[in-house]
A protein has these predicted regions:
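All-alpha prenyltransferase/terpene-synthase fold signal
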Residues: 1-183
């Protein structure tokens, strides 16, 4: 997934299908494996470990969408890092993909020029475009869909305490996402 992402660096024509494929192969697979192995080590049966793998894939994908949004709509205090680093390095993020799909070729071309000579002062211009096309809200809707998939996957987890703890992670990520873009 990381290699695929590096191959698409600076590609403003990247579509959502390819973007999500990268997420599944990158963060999704990492979370999926961790959850699957954790379930196996805890004595889960094959059905339960498969469900935990599905949960991890969905949670990891949701987390990556959140991280993409945090980089554009968060605060430096909340992010613990400078904002706009993904766009500065040419990484494709869901809000930017949505912007390019909806805004048309003029804004996409202007964005391409901005990225080539990126400076943090341009983040407010980009945020204006992202806001105009409601890309945060659309990204959050996709994140919530992934979190719903994660919760659905937990139906096969027998231990209610473990299931509740994993569901709590989805609620926490949802709350963090809901706080983005709020001044």
């Amino acid at each position: 997934g990381e290699i695929l992402q590096n191959n698409h660096q600076g590609n403003l024509a990247l579509g959502q299908a390819e973007y999500f494929k990268m997420l599944w192969m990158k963060t999704g697979e990492l979370f999926a494996l961790a959850c699957e192995l954790g379930g196996s080590l805890a004595g889960g049966d094959p059905r339960e470990t498969r469900a935990l793998r599905e949960y991890g894939m969905a949670l990891g994908t949701a987390y990556q969408v959140y991280d993409d949004c945090l980089d554009l709509f968060g605060s430096e205090a909340k992010a613990g890092k400078s904002l706009g680093t993904d766009i500065a390095s040419g990484k494709s993020t869901l809000p930017v993909i949505l912007l390019c799909e909806q805004a048309g070729p003029e804004i996409a071309a202007q964005l391409g020029r901005m990225i080539q000579q990126w400076d943090t002062g341009q983040l407010n211009i980009l945020r204006g475009w992202l806001s105009e096309f409601n890309t945060l809200e659309q990204s959050q809707a996709r994140l919530e869909s992934c979190l719903a998939d994660a919760r659905d996957a937990l139906g096969s987890v027998r231990d209610s305490n473990r299931r509740d703890a994993l569901e709590e992670l989805t609620r926490f990520l949802s709350q963090q996402s809901a706080g983005l873009g709020v001044a």
